[in-house]
């Protein structure tokens, strides 16, 4: 009889690196131009007035101002930057 268990294979035992998605600047906070407002996978939230969208669907500020979230067309969420 074997006195050690066989080193069987396993399908588990690994983990992916964190992606740090989500809102980075909350509604009502003051941001400067170029500040990342939120990181997302796909366009869950769309850019509104004075907000731009990056290649990876990151939404960022185009001007200095205050972040506001609202429901846009077809009840889709949008992010606007109001000038201060």
Swiss-Prot record:
Give the record's keywords alphabetically. Ribonucleoprotein, Ribosomal protein
> Which Gene Ontology terms of cellular component type are present?
cytosolic large ribosomal subunit
The UniProt entry, under InterPro entries, shows:
Ribosomal_bL27, Ribosomal_bL27_CS
List this protein's GO terms for biological process.
Answer: translation
Gene3D superfamilies hit by this protein: 2.40.50.100
Region Disordered, residue ranges: 1-21
Q: Sorted alphabetically, which Pfam families does this protein's record hold?
A: Ribosomal_L27 (PF01016)
PROSITE patterns reported in the protein's UniProt record: RIBOSOMAL_L27
Q: Name one GO molecular function term.
A: structural constituent of ribosome
The UniProt entry, under HAMAP family, shows: Ribosomal_bL27
Family stated for the protein in its record: Belongs to the bacterial ribosomal protein bL27 family.
Name it: Large ribosomal subunit protein bL27
List the lineage, top down: Bacteria, Pseudomonadati, Chlorobiota, Chlorobiia, Chlorobiales
Name the gene behind this protein. rpmA
